[in-house]
Amino acid sequence: MKAMILSAGRGLRLMPVTKNTPKPLVKVGKQTLLERNITLLYQSGITEIIVNGSWLGEQIESFISNIQLEGLKLHYLYEGSEPLGTAGAIYNAMDCNLLLNENFWLVNSDIITDFSLPNISLLNNRVGHLILVPNPEHNPNGDFGLRSDQVLNESVEMLTFSGISFLSCRMFDETTERSSSLVDIFRDKINHNLISGELFLGEWLDVGTVKRLNRAHNTFGKN
C-alpha cells in the first residue's frame, strides 16, 4: 500500500520558525513532524511513501534520503519554487507514475496523531474516505458533517477534517482542475455521495501555528 505526505507548504503561520527550516522538518520533541508521520505510516503497514516539497525542499530531500526502514520505499518530488497546491501535488505524482490506478493514503505533514490506519474498501463507487475529528479551538465551525459513514457538506453537527484521507486515483480525472484545492474536490464528490468517512477520537493536533506548535511541545515533547 502507498501513501503520500503533503509537505510543500510554505509554513508562513509558523514564522519565524520556518524561516530557515521547512515546516515538515520542524521538531516536536526529538522528532520532526515528517519523521513522526513517516513512522505512523510505516507502522501501519505502508510500504511506499511519496513526499513532495517546495520551500527549502533540498532539506526535505536530504532528510528522507537518510531514513532507512526495512521494506520501505521513499520518493521525493520537488515541485519548484511555487507549490502545485494540494490537488496539483497528487496530479504530479500521477504524472511521474508514482501513483497509478490505485488507492492510497494521503496525510498532511503538519499533524501529530496516534491514528492507526484501518483496512478500508471504497464501496459503491466511492472515491474517498475522510478521517474526521471533533472541532478544535481554531476551527469551531468544522468542515464536514457525517451521517453513518456518509460525509456531508452541511450538517447540524459539523466535524473537522483531520488531514488524513484514503483516496482513489479515480477522484483525479480530466474533469478536475489541477489548481483546485483538495477540499473543493472533496466537496464536489460529496455532492454526488462519493465520499465516506469516520470519526476519530484519539490524539490529534494540527501544528499549523506557533501557538499550536508550543502546545505540541507540551503534549508530545517527551517523545
Regions found by a protein language model. Name each.
Residues 1-60:
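N-terminal glycine-rich phosphate-binding loop and ensuing alpha1 helix
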Residues 66-142, 146-148:
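Conserved beta-loop-beta/alpha segment of the NTase-like Rossmann-fold superfamily
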Residues 29, 55, 81, 202, ...:
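Short beta->alpha linker loops
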Residues 36, 40, 59, 89-92, ...:
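Alpha-helical elements of Rossmann-like donor-binding domains used by nucleotide-donor carbohydrate transfer enzymes
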Residues 105, 112, 118-122, 135-138, ...:
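Catalytic-core segments of class I nucleotidyltransferases/pyrophosphorylases
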